[in-house]
């Protein structure tokens, strides 16, 4: 894509994983509530490419979208225990502002950072912990209805629905990525659920690179690595986006140490 990519929430964990992985592959416009230090910027990106604003600010978002070809929308309150007033303002209202500004500016596509919390209530007492293990074939594939387990998950489900609306009503290409458990270097330690939904930094960067480059209408995909033990299907991400993950939590012990020969 020749036009700049707007990345909201650029200073957060997901944003930094993306920028460290594919920072040299695109022209960026970065937006965050806080200034970004030089070590958080990819090569070729300067302070002139950083916008210190809030996604709930309609005027700021309208200006940020000018000339943009694609948006990766990560900004919001990331806390699973976040209260309603915060997720309503930052995650729901903020996401609607992003979608509306993207449409008004003629942006082609938006990749929306949804979350595993949008479907976490599928993890019932009768299914866990078996669903986290290799001998269980239960899979969520993105066609199921949201089933959030907290208000943060409700806000992410609302964001997915907003994306559906703006695709249907305005023709905006939208992909919602239900992100798993993102960690660098190794999967979450001593956390079976986290290892089943592990997303490595390099797979995260590659997945969002494909969100920028691929053609799609409206999609919900799961953002995890190619883990042997998983309960989220990544087949749709592979088929529609061309996602080719490289990492697998099974290459590590439950304690997060590399297995022999890996």
Residue ranges and their predicted role:
Residues 3-24:
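N-terminal Rossmann NAD(P)H-binding glycine-rich loop of SDR-like oxidoreductase domains
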Residues 47-48, 52-90:
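NAD(P)H-binding glycine-rich loop region in Rossmannoid oxidoreductase-like domains
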Residues 56, 86-97, 154-155, 199:
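Glycine-rich NAD(P)-binding loop of the Rossmann-fold in SDR/ketoreductase-type enzymes
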Residues 97-143:
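Conserved Rossmann-fold NAD(P)-dependent oxidoreductase catalytic core, especially the SDR/UDP-sugar
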Residues 141, 151, 155-158:
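Active-site helix of classical SDR
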Residues 160-185:
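Conserved beta-loop-beta element that borders a ligand/cofactor-binding pocket
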Residues 178-187, 198-219, 226, 241:
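Alpha-helical substrate-binding/gating segment
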Residues 219-221, 226-244, 260-261:
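Conserved C-terminal active-site "lid" loop/helix of NAD(P)H-dependent oxidoreductases
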